[in-house]
Amino acid sequence: MRAETSSGSKRTFKTLRTGFLGLVGVIAVYYALLFIFGIKYLNPQYYGSYFYAWRVNFADKLMTHGRYKLIKKNEHPETEDRKRFYRISQDKEGPYLIRFDRPEHFPRGHEHQFSLNFPAYEDFLKVRERFIVESEGLQENMKLEHSDLMEQMKKEKGGLFFASYSGKSVEEMMRILFPNNNADRNPWFDVSNILIRAVSRIMSQDEKDREGYLFDGSEVGDDLMKDIREGLDALDRSAGDGDVLLSEKISDADIKNFFINNGRVSGTPQETFAYSRLYYLFNFLTAGIEFKSERLAELRGDGESSNEFREARMDYVANVFARIFASIYPNQHKKDVSNIGVLEKVRNYYSPKMTVDPEKEVDDADLELVRESFSRSSRISA
């Protein structure tokens, strides 16, 4: 009797073990397929669709809703990188992230934002601050003492989103952001001009204009690569003694990987942070455009100063920018999958999501507004 019981227990154990190992095997195969088809060997023909759906469905919220939180100065080891970031984020010398509780992107969390700091970041925060002050008429806030700003941050509960600036053209926004022909020699002036040129070419109805700004899945268009290199050179003007130059640190291969990784929805913190700089500039430059989106039109009726409208507008502009960015990829933002074969269906099952909620889709009329606004904008000389 005992022998039978012992034998039965062994069979039960073997069955459970086999079942457990089988389950582990199935899970391992599933995640292996996710890695193979979802990251490693994604078909470049789908990059635009994957990228657009990823940004609109998930990633953009980190840019539009990110908020800075106070860092205790002695909470972490005082490395040189931490001290430099503390100086431009909440110190008396440069309280750029505590003066106004507005969106910022923290891919590694606010406590580790120092690891993404670079010489031209402070200049970017100056542009951001100027946009907030001018678009919201907050000149008086610039007079607040540092102690007042610190207390203000401790009491803030859910800050405002960026405002619109109705009626301002792209050219006018450039003059507002960089007054007196960029008298401060802010390098983001040049980057903004490059962005204007790139967007106008990417959205051009002339295929010859678009040709040099496309990414075919393996190579970056010559004109696009040239613009990126020009932008990096401009940002290097903020570098001090001992700073690593971006133009030397970032190779052509890194630039190519930027587009590949975004297409594979596997961007690094540095790559997503670079993307968010471009989005914010785009948001500032398009602040005066009155988009025709029905959702925004409804909220606009309650007043453009309402935080609900601001939030919806920021989210919408992020979707517009993602749509423009996606258009540099093969098949742009929407690959036709109606006639694909069985193997492609299996591949797409394990690949990133390609569908976007219709309510989040961008109105084609608004894309046309952006195209016209940027194509009319001429380069403003400093």
From Swiss-Prot:
Keywords, in A-Z order: Membrane, Transmembrane, Transmembrane helix
Compartments reported by the entry: Membrane
A single cellular component GO annotation: membrane
Membrane-spanning intervals of the chain: 19-39
Topology of this chain in the membrane: Single-pass membrane protein
Protein name: Uncharacterized membrane protein ECU07_0530
Species of provenance: Encephalitozoon cuniculi (strain GB-M1)
